[in-house]
Every structure is written in structure tokens, then in C-alpha cells.
From Swiss-Prot:
The gene is nuoB. It is found in: Cell inner membrane. The lineage of its organism: Bacteria, Pseudomonadati, Chlorobiota, Chlorobiia, Chlorobiales. This is NADH-quinone oxidoreductase subunit B. Gene3D superfamilies: 3.40.50.12280. It comes from Chlorobium luteolum (strain DSM 273 / BCRC 81028 / 2530) (Pelodictyon luteolum). GO terms for cellular component: plasma membrane; respiratory chain complex I. [4Fe-4S] cluster binds at residues 39-40, 104, 135.
Length: 189
């Protein structure tokens, strides 16, 4: 009686789709790199403090883009800073995700109309997966956004584009309130 004849009746054998195992590993060990530029950075730092304990979600902040798989852009992005944001994004390994935190990084904030030096949303230079609104958003909102990124990762499949994963997430009935997801093809002006 060989291994194939015995089957998989033993309790110590794990049989699961490769997608599920890879996605579980990715969403259980999210390594964000914070790119704090203004007031939202204070709330992002508060979220990383002991009161909210992001490590219980498997989220370990990193300072290097080469070690992170999530970029959190928090605050006002000026035209000069946009080049650095793109450079840091390109240094991140695949798969990479972007969370835009606060009104300034989402749409330019209070500077959008009269500020010639302010980028009118970070999604004009890099693709954004999850938006967290607020000025500045509370740490609870950021945690909710991080959990939304984890839901996006859970829905991905090998060979599936990010657009398809967003559509699949919407089909499951998970409402993104107060978070807004956008398709990656519409990002980047």
C-alpha cells in the first residue's frame, strides 16, 4: 500500500487551494510603509502606537519600500513630492497596494482650488486601492481601511487583475463604506 493508495485521511495533511494559502499569508502579514506628510501622519503614528496595536492584525510597519507591500500616503502631496512618491512606489515589490489617507491625499484637501503647488489627489501619479476620507481621519478609520485592503487581498486569485478582484469584492455584498475603492485602470492621470 503506497502513499497514493492511502489517500489523505491523516489529520496532519493540509489540502487547500494555493490562492487561499497565499492570500491568507499576505493578508495576515501586511507590511505598510507610511508616507506621512502632514496632519494625517499624526493620526497614522497614533494608530501604530500601543492604544490600537496594529500588530494584532498582523500589520508590522516598515521604513523601507523594498520590505513593504502597502504604501500609506497620508497628507498633502506637493508637485515636487509627487516624484518621490512615484519613486518609492516603484521600489516596492509586487504585489503592492496603496492606501490614500485623508482629504489632502485623496483629492487635494483644502488646497485643491487655490493651491497650484498641490497634487489634486495621489491617484494622479500612482494607482490607489483604498481611500480613507477625513481631515484627518481617526485611527479607527485607518484600521478600517487596512481591513479593507485585507479584504481585497482575500479576494485575489493568481492571474486575476486587481480590477477583477475589486469587482469580485463588490459582488460579495461587502459595502466599502466609508471607504472608496477605485479600479486601477482609472488611476494615474
Amino acid at each position: 500500500m503506497g502513499l497514493l493508495d492511502a489517500g489523505f485521511s491523516r489529520d496532519n495533511v493540509l489540502v487547500a487551494p494555493v490562492d487561499a494559502v497565499l492570500n491568507w499569508a499576505r493578508l495576515s502579514s501586511l507590511w505598510p510603509m507610511g508616507f506621512g506628510l502632514a496632519c494625517c501622519a499624526i493620526e497614522m503614528m497614533a494608530t501604530n502606537a500601543s492604544n490600537y496595536d496594529l500588530e494584532r492584525f498582523g500589520i508590522f510597519p516598515r521604513s523601507s519600500p523594498r520590505q513593504s507591500d502597502l504604501m500609506i500616503v497620508a497628507g498633502t502631496v506637493s508637485m515636487k513630492m509627487a516624484e518621490r512618491v512615484v519613486r518609492l512606489y516603484e521600489q516596492m515589490p509586487e504585489p503592492r497596494y496603496v492606501l490614500s489617507m485623508g482629504s489632502c491625499s485623496n483629492c487635494g484637501g483644502p488646497y485643491w482650488e487655490h493651491g497650484y503647488h498641490v497634487l489634486k489627489g495621489v491617484d494622479r501619479v500612482i494607482p490607489v486601492d483604498v481611500y480613507v476620507p477625513g481631515c484627518p481621519p481617526r485611527p479607527e478609520a485607518l484600521i478600517g481601511g487596512l481591513m479593507k485592503v485585507q479584504e481585497l487581498i482575500r479576494m485575489e486569485q493568481i492571474g486575476m487583475s486587481r480590477q477583477e478582484a475589486l469587482k469580485k469584492l463588490a459582488e460579495t455584498g461587502v459595502e466599502p463604506r466609508p471607504f472608496i475603492e477605485r479600479e486601477r485602470s482609472s488611476a494615474g492621470a
